[in-house]
Amino acid sequence: MSNFTAEDKAAITSLWGKVNVEDAGGETLGRLLVVYPWTQRFFDSFGSLSSPSAIMGNPKVKAHGVKVLTSLGEAIKNLDDLKGTFGSLSELHCDKLHVDPENFRLLGNVLVTVLAILHGKEFTPEVQASWQKMVAGVASALASRYH
């Protein structure tokens, strides 16, 4: 059963249709790595993450950010089954990568910040509430393997 109302779904999908995944993805992952530097430990293979400018200009950060937001796009298509949508990713992040599930919540909050920056007045409090609900649902689905 979904916790998303018809209004939530409309707010999420309407804004998502305007999101440039390449721009928002790189910005989101880059900001996560700058604001929460301990998350960098999962990205040793990305090369230099020595400064905010190195992180924000790193092509591997941008590419992985695109991958993350592309995955989020799949979630948006399956809001009624986030746990099922992220089952294999939850397993990967838990069993192989050993990512602290709190990082999923942090990433979601950074994404909401980026969307607010990129979409300005269109990112109303109501739209934000729907997106917060969605990123919390995604974080919970990604953390499901940990429980």
UniProtKB/Swiss-Prot annotation:
One of its GO terms (cellular component) is blood microparticle. Pfam families: Globin (PF00042). Heme b binds at H64, H93. Red blood cells. InterPro entries: Globin, Globin-like_sf, Globin/Proto, Hemoglobin_b, Hemoglobin_oxygen_transport. It comes from the Eukaryota. CDD domains: Hb-beta-like. Heterotetramer of two alpha chains and two gamma chains in fetal hemoglobin (Hb F). This is Hemoglobin subunit gamma. It comes from Alouatta belzebul.
